[in-house]
Swiss-Prot record:
One of its GO terms (biological process) is dTDP-rhamnose biosynthetic process. Keywords: Carbohydrate metabolism, Magnesium, Metal-binding, NAD, NADP, Oxidoreductase, Plasmid. Belongs to the dTDP-4-dehydrorhamnose reductase family. The keyword NAD applies. SUPFAM superfamilies: NAD(P)-binding Rossmann-fold domains (SSF51735). Its EC number is 1.1.1.133. This is dTDP-4-dehydrorhamnose reductase. It comes from Sinorhizobium fredii (strain NBRC 101917 / NGR234). DTDP-beta-L-rhamnose binds at residues 100-101, 149. Involved in the biosynthesis of the dTDP-L-rhamnose which is an important component of lipopolysaccharide (LPS). Catalyzes the reduction of dTDP-6-deoxy-L-lyxo-4-hexulose to yield dTDP-L-rhamnose. RmlD uses NADH and NADPH nearly equally well. The lineage of its organism: Bacteria, Pseudomonadati, Pseudomonadota, Alphaproteobacteria, Hyphomicrobiales.
Length: 296
């Protein structure tokens, strides 16, 4: 199986490369030779890669910065993704596209299903939703995976930020009134491989469309931080106090949904995939980062 993976330096792309089996060839695409904001590079890069399937991970992910750079966000998350999906369709290649929980407004009191009405409240969320529309219209042979609160040993993410802050702080204020599903990039990569194999082995329409893919369980940012620091305490013997605060007490340029929990039963029914509990995957990562030094 030959995968072309965009966003070569992102968390999920790096996790895919790290976990690839010998029978899987992963071609990672990224700047400067491949840039979603430059449509002219997209089609030629995909044609040269000659993949069996494309995993679309590249995105403009600076949620707050997008509020002042909407053109740049839409150029990548909508227009670039459309060019990618069109190129794939021209070659008869299926696309797995990663989207986000931020396509929802957060007003629903329970986890969101795939069929629920979207209503993004940030430029980033709107650009990602438009990207979903672009993929669906350009290439019917697609699977869109909405995920959330991604963390890993790679790049910048919440777990690594908390551990960095622990170096110089004994107490931290963390938002407690936003709920979501922390999701390990390693777990996502395993799921993506399974989905790719199924898509290549079957043309069933049931395997196409939108699916929610997130870690089992739920947490607020504060609860997430407290769990990270509970594992940190086990390893180091040092306690970090987390104080719950409201989102209003921690203003940011972009609004975040108060609830972006994702209901993932459709994914399990269709592909037999249910990701591990987020606490299990978080514990494994914190131990790796602190004891094994597997940082990137």
């Amino acid at each position: 199986m030959r995968l072309a993976v965009t966003g070569k330096n992102g968390q999920i792309a790096l996790a895919l490369k790290a976990q690839a089996r010998p029978d899987v060839e992963i071609l990672t695409l990224g700047r400067p030779n491949f840039d979603l904001a430059c449509r002219s590079t997209v089609a030629s890069s995909i044609r040269d890669a000659a993949p069996d399937i494309i995993v679309s991970l590249a995105a403009y992910t600076a949620v707050d910065k997008a509020e002042s750079e909407p053109y740049e966000a839409f150029a990548v998350n909508r227009d670039g993704v459309q060019a990618l999906a069109e190129a794939a369709a021209g070659l008869g290649v299926p696309v797995i596209h990663l989207s986000t929980d931020y396509v929802f407004d957060g007003a629903k009191p329970v986890p969101y299903c795939e069929e629920d009405r979207t209503g993004p409240i940030s430029v980033y969320g709107r650009s990602k939703l438009e990207g979903e529309f672009a993929v669906a219209s350009a290439n019917p042979n697609h699977t869109i995976l909405r995920t959330s609160w991604v963390y890993s040993r790679y790049g910048q993410n919440f777990v690594k930020k908390m551990l960095r802050l622990a170096d110089t702080n004994d107490e931290l204020n963390v938002v407690a009134d936003q709920l979501g599903c922390p999701t390990s990039a390693d777990d996502i990569s395993v799921a993506v491989m399974t989905i790719a194999r199924r898509m290549l082995s079957s043309s069933s329409a049931d395997l196409r469309g939108i699916f929610h893919l997130s870690g089992s369980g739920e947490a607020s940012w504060a609860a997430f931080a407290k769990y990270v620091f509970s594992v940190y305490d086990e390893i180091t013997g040092r306690q970090i106090k987390v104080h719950d605060i409201s989102a209003a007490e921690y203003p940011t340029p972009a609004r975040r949904p108060a609830n972006s929990r994702l209901h993932c039963d459709k994914l399990e029914r269709t592909f037999g995939i249910r990701l591990p509990n987020w606490e299990e995957s978080t514990r494994r990562l914190v131990w790796a980062l602190l004891l094994e030094g597997k940082d990137a």
